[in-house]
Amino acid sequence: MSQEIYDYANQLERAVRALPEYQKVLEVKEAIQADASASELFDEFVAMQEKIQGMMQSGQMPTAEEQTSIQELSQKIEANDQLKAYFEAQQALSVYMSDIERIVFAPLKDLVK
């Protein structure tokens, strides 16, 4: 039985990769990588996101200047059709991932009830 659970997990992984929503994220990501300005903006977003996550994990809040930078970056992203499409595709995929997470972790939640 223990090996069977890994087979199911691998099957789920393949099913996620086959989702049209996953394929759309890949497609848009490739388009971003092929466009220097979109790629640079995406890299800037990732760096900002990592910085903010690090700050939040250490209990810090972004300064007013950093909040302004975040807002400006968000506006640039909204103005870029490829990045906008990427985040929309990510959002559609995240619906599936949230549902899968809820289903997979239900037995663990039962253990703490």
From Swiss-Prot:
InterPro entries: Com_YlbF, YheA/YmcA-like_dom_sf. Pfam families: Com_YlbF. Belongs to the UPF0342 family. This is UPF0342 protein Spy49_0636. It comes from Streptococcus pyogenes serotype M49 (strain NZ131).
